Amino acid sequence: VKIIKIFVIVFLSIVILAGAFLGVMTFLEYRPEDVTELPIENNQDQILSLNTELSIMIYNIGYAGLGEDEDFVMDGGKQGIPSSQDVVEDYFEGIKSTLLDYPSDFYLLQEVDLKARRSYHIDQVLGITSALGDDYSTQFAYNFKSPFVPFPVSLTEYIGYVESGIATYATYRVESSTRYQLPGAFAWPLRVANLKRAIMVSILDIQDSDNDLYIINLHLSAYDASGTLREQEMAFLKEYLIELEELGHYVVVGGDFNQTFPEAEGLYPVQEGLWEAYAIEDSFLPSGYRFEIDTTTPSCRLLNQPYDPSSELTQYYIIDGYIVSNNITVLSYDGIRDAGAMTLDLGFGDADHHPVVMKFLLNEGD
């Protein structure tokens, strides 16, 4: 009887503690508005012009914690966080060097930590702002904010506190920057410590034009087994793109779609048991737009193991790229290759994604 009583007390204590934890997490859950106007730090004075060459880079930097020596538990690896602050700092220095090595008018970055246990509380938004210097404005939108992420279940590897999101840096004057919450969410209680996906829309005036340039930074859902989140996010994006096309604006969407582009289907067959990126439907792209991707180089690797290009278990994807409106001309990036986006093959040294760069101009009279 005494043993049963002890068991009951222990069991009830666990239930009460778990309930209290979920209650606190639910109370503290990040609940963003559907539309949030964002501050533009250090906004620039330079105004866009038609028929002027512009450059852009998209780069999921993986919070400087997913470089060549790392794996990740959600991808079939073992780690929840990098092993030390030195590891993160080394990757972060490499990431900043890459940004400086490929100067761009616009940088659209994903998985940038403002403050998080997994990146040892390094303010990466500020670090990149400082590295780029005074010629860039900074815009940041949350898509992951939680006081405690209890995953993976481990005394040392748990993710813990997270403030993270997407960041856009620009050398031209940005008239407004807005965070749009994407539809769909995981069910409670998974929802309380999970990502709240969004797009960040930067609007820029253009000299001698009644239309504007819309730069859209995004990072769409990945671990969505049913595909329902993806469907809702893509439907939202499509509707927004149709609206902008009808108004005649110039549009560049860039980021990590976490989906395989139609032109890239079948290039990297997914091995059995590994994460598979949904394919973007052929019918998704609205009239007046086209994809701009590089099919010659993978943009992402799976984190089921540290990077080993000779291993049969190394899985690649092409899930990072652009959507561009037809009133924009895309140029050759290096003057050698054909016109189009170009993925920078950096050997996944500092992140599990490669940067994708592009040069373009806004057509006059469109």
Model-predicted regions and their roles:
Residues 5, 21-44, 242-252, 258-366:
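Metal-dependent phosphoester-hydrolase catalytic domains
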Residues 137-145, 177-183, 333-337:
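Conserved S-adenosyl-L-methionine
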